[in-house]
Amino acid sequence: MLWEAPTYPFVRYLEAHFPEIQAEADLLATEDYDDWPQKDGYSGSWKVYCFFSRDPRWYLAASCPPNARRCPQTLSVVQRIPGVSRAGFSLLLPGTYIAPHRDGKNGIEDLLRCHMGLRSNPKAGMRVGKKTVSWEPGHCLIFDGNEEHEAANLGDTPRVVLMVDIDREALETEIPA
């Protein structure tokens, strides 16, 4: 299920900070990202640059502290959002396809996933349930990762999003001043 993103305080907050978040992501080279660890679920090159996790047991948590030093403004923005569990940049290189899957097995059963487009192209998109969407720079998509979804970048430029997992109960919470 896709959620109507603009109504939530954290979405307005993230979108207001789009320029500095995009600028920090743009400083990263493809080599700075790690391959998404579950390699049997995709073809092509899906990479992640994790910089925040509240759960040290999460399989990407070890990379967060050193990575956070490379994106201090983005980390500061994300840390102010109530209910954030983890965050990072997700990179799909051209020709990448992520097969249909559900995220519940990855420990996000009670979380929603937010993607804020940073760089994309018209041939990059995602299907959640029966709805297909594409990423627009500076705009957020929120979806329930427990619902079947898939993604692809069939274009000729990389797709980069800020990926934030947030507790469902915190969606309406205002950002502290």
Regions found by a protein language model. Give the residues of each.
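A short beta-strand-loop-beta hairpin characteristic of the jelly-roll/cupin
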Residues: 100, 117-137
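A short, compositionally biased micro-patch
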Residues: 92, 119-121, 136, 144, ...
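Fe(II)/2-oxoglutarate oxygenase catalytic core
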Residues: 1-111, 121-124, 158, 173-177
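A short hydrophobic beta-strand segment most commonly corresponding to one strand
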Residues: 111-117, 140-142, 157-173
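Acidic/histidine-enriched, beta-strand-rich ligand/metal-binding domains
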Residues: 132-136, 147-168, 176
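Short beta-strand His + acidic residue motifs that chelate non-heme Fe in jelly-roll/DSBH
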Residues: 98-101, 125-126, 143, 149-155
